[in-house]
Amino acid sequence: MNQTLAAATLAAALALGNGPAWAADSVQDPIERGRYLVRIGGCNDCHTAGYLETAGRSPEADWLTGSAVGFQGPWGTTYPANLRIALANYSEAQWIARARSEMRPPMPWFNLAAMTDDDLKAMYRYVRSLGARGTPAPDYAAPGQAVNTPYFVFVPQNLPPKTAGR
């Protein structure tokens, strides 16, 4: 009885462990794969104005057109780029090189850089399939430079004091 239960538990764990990879790998068309990666990667959270406020129900026609709401921190003020305009001006190779490069906060560039070339190509093809639309995001503002757009202050508050040795 215990061996049967252990075997069933192991089989279930293996099936569940492979579930997300199977689901992701089952998307063979590069454009559909790119759509999937954009959605689960959270690209729209910042790069689509109003996406969070609509709980992800923004029309796909509006996806990845950037935002005029900035993120301000010690690095200055950055704005989510209009990826549809940006990628319309990049070759696939230029996109992959850019995706592997360090970017200003709060862009989680290290997550993008960890993606496979095939995933980055799929994202590129998806964004290009949407076509260029919208206007460029506002320009970067250096630390201390005044901005006249809305922005989030990205500085943690109420952090505990640093402990020696950590």
Q: Which residues are covered by each model-predicted region?
A:
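A structural feature that tracks compact, well-ordered secondary-structure segments
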Residues: 84-88, 97-98, 109-111
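Local sequence-structure signature of Cys/Sec-based thiol-disulfide redox active-site neighborhoods
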Residues: 35-41
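An amphipathic alpha-helix signature
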Residues: 92-96, 100, 117, 121-124
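Positively charged n-region of N-terminal signal peptides that target proteins for export
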Residues: 1-5
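Flexible coil segments in periplasmic/lumen-exposed cytochrome c-class electron-transfer proteins
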Residues: 27-29, 40, 48-78, 109-166
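Short, cysteine/histidine-rich loop/knuckle motifs that typically chelate Zn2+
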Residues: 45
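Sec/Tat signal peptide C-region and signal peptidase I cleavage site
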Residues: 19-25
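Hydrophobic helical h-region of N-terminal Sec-dependent signal peptides
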Residues: 6-14
